[in-house]
Amino acid sequence: MAKLSLRNVQKTYAGNVKVVHGIDMEIADGEFIVIVGPSGCGKSTLLRMVAGLETITGGDIHIGDRVVNNLEPAERDIAMVFQNYALYPHMSVYDNMAYGLKIRGMAKAEIEQRVKHAAGILELAPLLDRKPRQLSGGQRQRVAMGRAIVREPSVFLFDEPLSNLDAKLRVQMRLELKELHRRLGTTSLYVTHDQVEAMTLADRMMVLNGGRVEQIGTPLEVYTRPASTFVAGFIGSPPMNLVPVARNGGMAGAGGVAQMRVLGKEGGASDATLGHLPMGLHLPAEALLGLRPEHIEPCAAHDAIAEVDVRVVEALGADSFAYGSLGGQPIVVRLDSHARVRAGDKLPVTSSPDHLHFFDAQSGKRIEA
């Protein structure tokens, strides 16, 4: 095992096309880091640079106490698990797992010990004589992970390993990956576009957008204190509501605290207000109020800070979601499954000041009080 350091890591292709912009991160020995972001954000490129499959055009990558920029993949003491399994179809499960060790000239007894140990961890022992075509998708992915485990690397690299699995199997494999990391404790870097994988697997996560880091933090930190409107909109399902707001003409409300007014779609003030601004918060001319759907609560009309015009209600079993508008702006409210809310209703809502997030509408950056 080893720590992993990314120091001003950059990638530029021919024609001065820059896809990774100076990424810095210190990954502790044994930490499980998830890089998450939309397609084309540079996450797989960054992983491939760590693996040695892409050249680095700026900065340094350290694995342990070595700078590995110019080392071949085989010299970096890493093991990689790919999206497409990459198993040899003519080989048995045992031989697929053992092949890399044989190439390295390891003793037969040591190979057998490592393969059987990994097979025991992954519950593959009864399948060692089978060919890949005789396995399910989840079993094939476990073989791919077993092939990485037997190498006993300093760092595991995972490139969207669950993307080819169906929804039910992805849940099962997430749990198995979490348990695997708990048992092995190997430093791991995991790439995904799936926020659920990121939230459930990560010790810390890096949110990438356009080759730049939007935020690094624990899943709870990223969810509860998003650093930008991009993070607020990307992490969470449904995502955070982002409502354009302004001071209510500079007028003070109760206790001398300014009120917020929702801005309509054309940028003009609507008739909707949203309670009072937190003390000490200074809004720029253009600001966005962020509210998670679960933090908007239906209430009695006299307690409401706003009223939502409900257009659609989706029932999902334990929860329901009301989709509607507030002052002409789209908004989503999470409801109890037993809530009697219908399309066409006007739903009075409230929210705790602790759950209000504010962002600069121009830069998208979080505004702190």
Curated annotation (Swiss-Prot):
Subcellular location, principal: membrane
A Gene Ontology cellular-component term: ATP-binding cassette (ABC) transporter complex, substrate-binding subunit-containing
Biological process (GO), any one: glycerophosphodiester transmembrane transport
Localization: Cell inner membrane
Keywords: ATP-binding, Cell inner membrane, Cell membrane, Membrane, Nucleotide-binding, Sugar transport, Translocase, Transport
SUPFAM superfamilies, A to Z: MOP-like, P-loop containing nucleoside triphosphate hydrolases
Database matches in Gene3D superfamilies: 2.40.50.100, Nucleic acid-binding proteins (2.40.50.140), P-loop containing nucleotide triphosphate hydrolases (3.40.50.300)
Enzyme class at the top of the EC tree: translocase
GO molecular function terms noted in the UniProt entry: ABC-type glycerol-3-phosphate transporter activity; ATP binding; ATP hydrolysis activity
Topological category with respect to the lipid bilayer: Peripheral membrane protein
InterPro entries registered for this protein in UniProt: AAA+_ATPase, ABC_transporter-like_ATP-bd, ABC_transporter-like_CS, ABC_transpr_MalK-like, ABC_transpr_MalK/UgpC-like, Mo/tungstate-bd_C_term_dom, NA-bd_OB-fold, P-loop_NTPase
Residues bound to ATP: G37, P38, S39, G40, C41, G42, K43, S44
Catalytically driven reaction(s): sn-glycerol 3-phosphate(out) + ATP + H2O = sn-glycerol 3-phosphate(in) + ADP + phosphate + H(+)
SMART domains cross-referenced by the UniProt entry: AAA
Occurrences of domain ABC transporter (ranges): 4-235
Keyword match S-adenosyl-L-methionine: no
EC number: 7.6.2.10
Family note: Belongs to the ABC transporter superfamily. sn-glycerol-3-phosphate importer (TC 3.A.1.1.3) family.
Function: Part of the ABC transporter complex UgpBAEC involved in sn-glycerol-3-phosphate (G3P) import. Responsible for energy coupling to the transport system.
Subunit structure: The complex is composed of two ATP-binding proteins (UgpC), two transmembrane proteins (UgpA and UgpE) and a solute-binding protein (UgpB).
Protein name as catalogued: sn-glycerol-3-phosphate import ATP-binding protein UgpC
Source species of the chain: Cupriavidus pinatubonensis (strain JMP 134 / LMG 1197)
Organism taxonomic ancestry: Bacteria, Pseudomonadati, Pseudomonadota, Betaproteobacteria, Burkholderiales
